[in-house]
Amino acid sequence: MHIVLEFFLVTFRVLWAFVLAAGKWLLRPKDKSVAGQVCLITGAGSGLGRLFALEFARRRAQLVLWDINSQSNEETAEMVRNIYRELEAEDSARRANSSAEEEVLPCCNLKVYTYTCDVGKRESVYSTAERVRREVGDVYLLLNNAGVVSGHHLLECPDELIERTMMVNCHAHFWTTKAFLPKMMELNHGHIVSVASSLGLFSTAGVEDYCASKFGVVGFHESLSHEIKASDKDGIKTTLVCPYLVDTGMFRGCRIRKEIEPFLPPLKPDYCVKQAMRAILTDQPMICTPRLMYIVTCMKSILPFEAVVCMYRFLGADKCMYPFIAQRKQATNNNEAKNGI
């Protein structure tokens, strides 16, 4: 009898979860504040990482930027400083124009910290994380964004590049999370964001290493989310970001069928980041961009494999990475010829 009652209770909770999800979809929750909170972003020197940094800066977060390229990372930091200066000017203007009765925002007094770190190396992650704790303080939001792509067919890809892809795209999430999650657990306060890819939900030919790394991120993130829930740490949130192809140049040359491409073009980086920010600031567990990716993932799960192959061929998705791989190979050959290799 006890298990029967529990079954009905679970059924009610499942249905209630659907109601809450529908309510959040219809009535968007208010964005939470990250003002003054320490937000660490990996791969902040370019692409989505840079755009995430600028978005969090506009929301007055205290930023810690990691990248393997110190020059590009510093360029992002200077953009962040410009935003901070603009915010400080706005605060000063408000104080000057406000009456005594009006509440005035305090001065920003925000700083951005840059660290050169190779997230593909465990020792580099742990040593840099220790510096962050010592020089900045506790990290509230960890955004794992750093990623690489080899751009080779499996049988032509050097083993070292496969290992590098797995280390940077997947293993780094383990190292950074192990470095910063303990304090979040202690305080029951934090947020972990994993930037994966639609290629972590379904795959295509020619990017076996990249797909494996992103599938790994999705599995890691889902298991981590369950572990946090099992620990009853309801103050720690997680968000999984799975965008479709983003027009950052990382997959330049990738093409689906030309008749279909106008309906499913590469995502603009700004749009992708704004959608992800909306999910992060409302504690949404997962965001796929565009929403069509939810349907594709569901269909891939229920359709026979041959049916999926048929759909891929119709969309031109079966060999969509081949032009990208050819361009990367040509660029490599040109570079070797230029350097006399």
Swiss-Prot record:
SUPFAM superfamilies: NAD(P)-binding Rossmann-fold domains. It catalyses: all-trans-retinol + NADP(+) = all-trans-retinal + NADPH + H(+). It is a single-pass membrane protein. One of its GO terms (molecular function) is oxidoreductase activity, acting on the CH-OH group of donors, NAD or NADP as acceptor. Keywords: Endoplasmic reticulum, Membrane, Microsome, NADP, Oxidoreductase, Signal-anchor, Transmembrane, Transmembrane helix. Pathway: Cofactor metabolism; retinol metabolism. Substrate binds at residue 197. Its main location: membrane. GO terms for cellular component: endoplasmic reticulum membrane; lipid droplet. Belongs to the short-chain dehydrogenases/reductases (SDR) family. This is Retinol dehydrogenase 10-A. The lineage of its organism: Eukaryota, Metazoa, Chordata, Craniata, Vertebrata. The gene is rdh10-a.
